[in-house]
Amino acid sequence: YKGNRSCGLSTIGCTSFFPSKPLGAYGDAGASFTADPELAKAMRQIIEHGQESRYKHVRLGLNGRMDSLQAAVLLSKLQVFDDELIKRNSVAEQYTELLIEHVSRELVELPTVQHYNKSSWAQYTIRVSRRDQVRTNLAQAGVPTAVHYPIPLYQQESLAEVTLDCENTETAVQQVLS
């Protein structure tokens, strides 16, 4: 965002290194970032079973450490990550150009990135009013697609007590296609 990496824009930034992510490990992994020393100390304690030092537990915690193999994979990938982002942005530009050339803008809403931002393009997601029909047609033509997060978070069982009116979300979950 405006030349800054997104994990440094708030008090705590988090990222996933799930294998399908642009900077993905070979297994589950993630990280949290902060510039606040006290928060950093608390975050380290939480991922070390709540330990302040060996066998001295000062808070509830869990085993949230990244294993050495995942760290090694990520360190290796991090060395070429800027080049990876350039390539991903190039592919996204090609998708956009081809869709503009071949598909009516009335049928498809393309993703946009503000001039002062860069995207890592974890997915290239469009909005299509007749998504399921388009998805079927693409599958028949051998083009793989995905619908990410088809059920809004506020409709998940864990949030059953929450009542929200999210009209834009309702529309999006019926239209998004990657």
What are these regions, as identified by a protein language model?
Residues 35-178:
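PLP-dependent aminotransferase class I/II
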Residues 29-34:
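Conserved RNP beta-strands of RNA recognition motif
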Residues 1-24, 53-58, 109:
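Conserved active-site segment immediately N-terminal to the catalytic lysine
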